[in-house]
Amino acid sequence: LFFFSVLSISQDIGFSNVLDAVYPDENNLKFPKVYSADTAKNTTYNINLVVYSEKKSTVKLNYSSLEFDRISFNEVLDVPVEQNTGLDSRTEKFRGNINPFVIRRAPFRIYEIIKPISNNVINTNSNFSLINVKIPIHKNLKSDKYQINFTIKLNDMKFNLKLKLNVHDVN
């Protein structure tokens, strides 16, 4: 008898701070389903969603909130990094000095270009995908604690995420 096994990648999705380094090929990330943050009135709060899935997966994004009705989703596209920054020049190649402070050795790809999602659906191109969420915080919103519920369907799996925002006055 011949046994064939198909290895399928697990699927997951969670919040990620916009300052976290996220790559299309590999990451050592957690996928928190609940995230709390502080923000100010009259700004736009940004948070990322990291999707871990098979390539060509379908991700459908939805949210519910009484206070926030203009949330936008943006797919963050990856670009190549071909050379590392040099210690005393634009790249290491100019003088040949290796920069020990880089977070990853080139060549690799990194997320950088933001593309608006018009119908709240994307199809993934790599095992990790990055979705930027922009939440306008109105200047007349009361300083308080708010919650936004996200329902995300990744292929046939449903994920429920909660973003807790503490909105503050800026004086």
How should these model regions be labeled?
Residues N46-Y52, K134-P136:
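Short edge beta-strand/loop segments characteristic of extracellular beta-sandwich folds
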Residues T151-N155:
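Beta-strand-rich extracellular modules
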Residues F3-L7:
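N-terminal signal peptide c-region/cleavage motif recognized by signal peptidases
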Residues F128, K158-N160:
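A structural signal for beta-strand boundary/capping segments at domain termini and interdomain linkers
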